[in-house]
Structures are given as C-alpha cells and as structure tokens.
Amino acid sequence: MVNKIPISVKFYGELRDRLPYKKMKAGIPNTLKIEINEFKTVLDLLKEFGIAENEISHIFVNGVYSGAGKIIKDGDRIGIFPKRMGLMFMEITKINSIYTKITFHEELKEFGLKEAIVDLPEGSTLNSILNKYGLSNKRHQIEIIVNGKPIHESDYILKDWDNIAIFSL
C-alpha cells in the first residue's frame, strides 16, 4: 500500500485559471489541499496538473525558493508562480543553494563562458540549466554528461557539485 501525504499547493497568476477547481477573484491564489503519494517531486506535481516546468518562474516549498526537482514531504506548503510574475522575485536570496560546474564544449561556448560554477535552488533540474543558457530548444542537438554519465532526461535532478559537460552533436 502506498502512503499518502497531505500538502497545500497555491497556484498564482494565470496558472490558477488553468485548474478545473474553484475559481478565485483576481490576485488571490488558487489553494488546493490534496494528498499525494510519498516521494513525489514538485515536477511530478506540475505534470499531474498539465503544467510544463518552462512555464514556471519560481517555486517555494515552505517559504524557501526551490527547484522543480525538490522532493515533497508530509505537510509541505508549495507556492507555484508563472513566468509572467518572475520580476516580483528578482532579489531573492537563494537559500539552500546547490552549486554545479558547467563546461561548454566546442561551438556551445557562445552560450556562456567555457566553464562556470553556477548556484541554483535545491531541487533544480537539468531543464533549469538549459533554460538559463537558452539551450532548451536545442536539446536534441546537444549531448549532456553529468558526472561522467550521459543524461537524456531534462527533468534529471541536479545535486550539489555535479559536473555538467555540454557537447554539440
């Protein structure tokens, strides 16, 4: 038997209007109190509601800025904001950051420095790196190696001090 855990999810902006649940007045988030299977990530939750990770600006879990790969725990409060609301959070202090080393090979150097150390919110996915460097539309033209292993899933959850190498195919 799979254990279910209760969580609270708030959808803001146009995300709240896409849900089939109760509609709120403008400016008020749509809050859902639901039960989910243990060990799901925020990304799993987004998929269940038909929301793509690239539609999201910011995710907060219990008030802490987080990535889509953050594992949801019993009683978590999750706030999900759309891209259009991104400017509201320009000066967030990133609590619980992870650091990754990214190396761009060959002609991909045009998308950033040859090598960079990047801080990301805990639970960030490979997709967040691709979006950050404008590579999400080139996913099928690049090879991504994380810690020496090829990774083909954009929703791969990054860990602290992962080494990411990006090659052109």
Describe the predicted segments one by one:
Residues 1-169:
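Ubiquitin-like/PB1-type beta-grasp interaction modules and other compact soluble beta-rich domains
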